[in-house]
Amino acid sequence: MVSTKTQIAGFEFDNCLMNAAGVACMTIEELEEVKNSAAGTFVTKTATLDFRQGNPEPRYQDVPLGSINSMGLPNNGLDYYLDYLLDLQEKESNRTFFLSLVGMSPEETHTILKKVQESDFRGLTELNLSCPNVPGKPQIAYDFETTDRILAEVFAYFTKPLGIKLPPYFDIVHFDQAAAIFNKYPLKFVNCVNSSGNGLYIEDESVVIRPKNGFGGIGGEYIKPTALANVHAFYQRLNPQIQIIGTGGVLTGRDAFEHILCGASMVQVGTTLHKEGVSAFDRITNELKAIMVEKGYESLEDFRGKLRYID
């Protein structure tokens, strides 16, 4: 009997699939829908300290091979998600969930993380260092000096399981430099990747989203090769105790299989979940299991990270 069970930081999950932060996770109702689906767990919308409206609409557009968005971190504020998770972990103590968060400044990031540290939250925390869609705010993880400083400051007080969501990197030297920084800290996971920032999609003679004159993060099939490269590059470079969540271009079980083959311990679904709804988790899981049966694999460990090279 094949199994898609997995674990992150010692927490076990019945399935390796989950939503990506930003999709099907704004409200408790959406999170409940993911929780009750075939997904192994969920991650909340990336929370800031206070409620954010986000960027003006239209700010999301499905396009033939994926999506473009410039949402601008709309969310209901940290307390909304943290209170829900604190209640949920008492009701469903056998399951573990992810809380995504980021501050609009380094000071706010520390305020948020200290609040989580002081709470009774027992799940996994994901610090988003990679949002490309807040005007005037750079993607932190492209600035290695700032990333190093923030992680040093965070781990001076934060002792709960923490991972970071990363933007896509495109240069081998950047993989080396980023991994050298991440290996200095007790990170539990890195999430590769957020949307590929600042693409343009045009219909007729116009952009399709309003913020930033149409520039937005690209998701879906467009980014799978980049996502796989990031997953595998960090799998090769990171300490074994830093696991990898693969995100980007997961439409089918084959896509999920490739993320795991490259080294991912969990796989997030974003654009496809937005287009198809939570039934996508069932379909992708069944497709993944069919591939495993065909290849004679019984568990994810049988093929995780075992990408073959050409001599």
Swiss-Prot record:
InterPro entries in the cross-refs: Aldolase_TIM (IPR013785), DHO_dehydrogenase (IPR050074), DHOD_1A (IPR033886), Dihydroorotate_DH_1 (IPR024920), Dihydroorotate_DH_1_2 (IPR012135), Dihydroorotate_DH_cat (IPR005720), Dihydroorotate_DH_CS (IPR001295)
Catalytic-site annotation from UniProt: 131 (nucleophile)
Binding site for FMN: 45-46, 128, 165, 193, 220, 248-249, 270-271
Keywords: Cytoplasm, Flavoprotein, FMN, Oxidoreductase, Pyrimidine biosynthesis
Catalytic activity: (S)-dihydroorotate + fumarate = orotate + succinate
Cofactor (UniProt): FMN
GO cellular component assignments: cytoplasm
Subcellular location: Cytoplasm
EC number(s) from the headed UniProt entry: 1.3.98.1
Pathway: Pyrimidine metabolism; UMP biosynthesis via de novo pathway
GO MF term (any one): dihydroorotate dehydrogenase activity
UniProt cofactor note: Binds 1 FMN per subunit.
GO biological process: one example: 'de novo' pyrimidine nucleobase biosynthetic process
Binding-site positions, substrate: 45, 69-73, 128, 194-195
Known partners and oligomeric status: Homodimer.
Functional description taken from the UniProt entry: Catalyzes the conversion of dihydroorotate to orotate with fumarate as the electron acceptor.
PANTHER family (alphabetical): DIHYDROOROTATE DEHYDROGENASE (FUMARATE) (PTHR48109:SF1), DIHYDROOROTATE DEHYDROGENASE (QUINONE), MITOCHONDRIAL-RELATED (PTHR48109)
Family: Belongs to the dihydroorotate dehydrogenase family. Type 1 subfamily.
Protein name as it appears in the record: Probable dihydroorotate dehydrogenase A (fumarate)
